[in-house]
Every structure is written in C-alpha cells, then in structure tokens.
Amino acid sequence: MLRIPAMGILFVIILLYTFPTMDYLNETLLPLIESITPRQSESYTLSALNLNRQSSQSILISFGERIEQFWNKVISDSNSLNLIEDNNLIEVNGKTRQIDHNFVSEEDGVNYYLESKCNLNFDSEKIKASNKKINEVREALGADEGAYFVPVVREINQKDLTKYNNKGLKVYGVEWLLNQSNTKFTVDEYFTYLETVIAPVLENKGL
C-alpha cells in the first residue's frame, strides 16, 4: 500500500480544498466522516492483557452509515427523485425496516430500491436473509427493482455479479449510480478523494 508523507498529505488536502470541483465533497462527505467517534474495543482478550484499543470495526460501521447518508444527499442534489427525503422507514410484515436508497432515476425512469453494503462477503444464511429483505422492501415500496449498492467499489467484479444475479438480484457500484444522475463530481474524483482525504482522517481516528 502506498504511504504518503505527512507533508504530502497536507499538500493534497490544501489542493483539494482549493480545487473547485472538490467543493461538493468537502462540504458534504468530509464533515460526515469527521463526525465519527471511535469506541473502545470490548474484548475479553484485551481486558486480560490489560490493553486498551479503539475498535476499528466501530469506525468501519460508522463509515458505512455516513457514506449511506452522503449518497442520499447526492441523489437529492441530482435530477433524480429521492423518494425518502422525508421518511426512510417502512412497515414490512409487521417489522419496521430502514430504506437505504429509494429513487426514480432521471436516466431511465426506473424506481430503484437499493440496499447499501460496503461488504458483500456474507455467509450463505446472511445472504438469504438480506436478499429476502430486499425483495420484501421492494414489494412494500412498489419499486421496480431491488438491488445492492456498494458505495466503495467502482464496478462490481464478475464473481459477485454472478453470485447475486443467480439469486435474482443485481449489484451496482459507484460508476453505475453516477451514470443514473447528474452529479457534481466524477467517479475518479470520488475515489481520489476517498484515498487522499478520507483515508488519512480515518487513520487518525484509529483505523
């Protein structure tokens, strides 16, 4: 993994703050990530060793929650119609379910329900439960399509596509979602920003 010297990181951050096309990411994504507060690891092993460590898992979970908020903002700021701006909860079979993303695409007019996942490496039972939830929520919403959205992958690899397509579900990456709406940044700018600005922030928090 490439390590950038501290002064290099500072230069990149200053450059991005003054680069007009990055204003949107600075104003929307960065504050969400900066608001993450790591928790201490709750581990019997660490306790026995009398070691205090921050939970990297808590940081990743918080990142997943905030990146979901960010992409809802992106959808709202585009010409697509964000259907969950006022309410992202729905009753499904007696249970309250959270809606990650639900919008009508300006590109193809399709009503999409997307389940946001930063990781697709589930065990088989969790995959079944998650797939079932997507189909149930899609039906309750009356959406045309239910699918997974991975906000940290440019394009989904063929292995994951095949695995989920065989179960009747699609999986989309960032490039696909950006193609559905007019956005204020490109896919290259997004991933460069994650690497050069967001990564150092999360490292400083203990990731």
Predicted regions and their residues:
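Charged, structured surface patches that assemble and position nucleic-acid processing machinery
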Residues: 161-207
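Active-site beta-strand-loop-beta-strand hairpin of nuclease catalytic cores
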Residues: 96-113
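Short, well-structured alpha-helical interface segments that form or flank functional binding sites
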Residues: 62-70, 98, 125, 129-132
